[in-house]
Amino acid sequence: MSSVARGGEALPENDLEPVWEPFMLIYEGELVLYYSDQRDPDNTLGQKMVHQTTTDLLNWGPIVDDVHYDNATFRPGMPIISELPTGDWILTYEFFGAEEGGFHVYYRISDSPLTFDAQPGIPILPADGSSPEGSPYNVWSPAGGENGTIVVSDGNNTPLYLNRALGAEDAWTTLEVPAGASYTRALLVLPNDPSRIMIVAGGVLGGEDNSVLVTTIDLEEENGKGNKHGHRQHGKACWGKGRGKGRGKGRGHGW
């Protein structure tokens, strides 16, 4: 057992020192642990995103910045990283302080998952004018075209956001899915059928009667609809029919 980082009181306020929102991946024989860090006095105790690495799970390397801003009121957070077929890497994050307002979802692309801080932050701006905000998650699937598909979820809206051009700024589209908005939805490319994406949602932040919904959608299905969705309410499983708009087909299971 090893301890990577220790923080203070877990409130999103400057002058406190929490660490949170971890994400891990393996890269070139090292385990890379990303997290949001509010302990840096040189950052006037504002939040930034960092990583540390280990080869033995006992000893951890120095803290390396992944996203930081000079303005201490800015709060980048919720790092998620995926590899693209070109060998590049994509990082998505929520950004309080964004010109778009709220916690707009931004991304960075780098040729190494260890050098995101050297790359510019880019807002996800779908062609339909929608605004993804908060607690993003991303995966890459080989389905959907010669470049595959980058799939991004956010915490405030029901759709997924797709990019079939390796992250080009002007190539984001919106896909309506049966899964409801949730804090925070996780995505998984199904290994036996990479055209299918699993969405796992645990309900809203602070909810008193939340549900857990698992939905699968097909990136290559035209004009699909949701087949089934479910949730557990007061200990009882409830099921119903649902519909999704646009490209994609989905079904859900609740517990």
Predicted feature locations:
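Beta-rich carbohydrate-recognition and catalytic domains
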Residues: 1-17, 26-72, 83-130, 142-147, ...
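Beta-propeller and closely related beta-sheet repeat lectin domains
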Residues: 20-23, 77-80, 134-137, 183-188
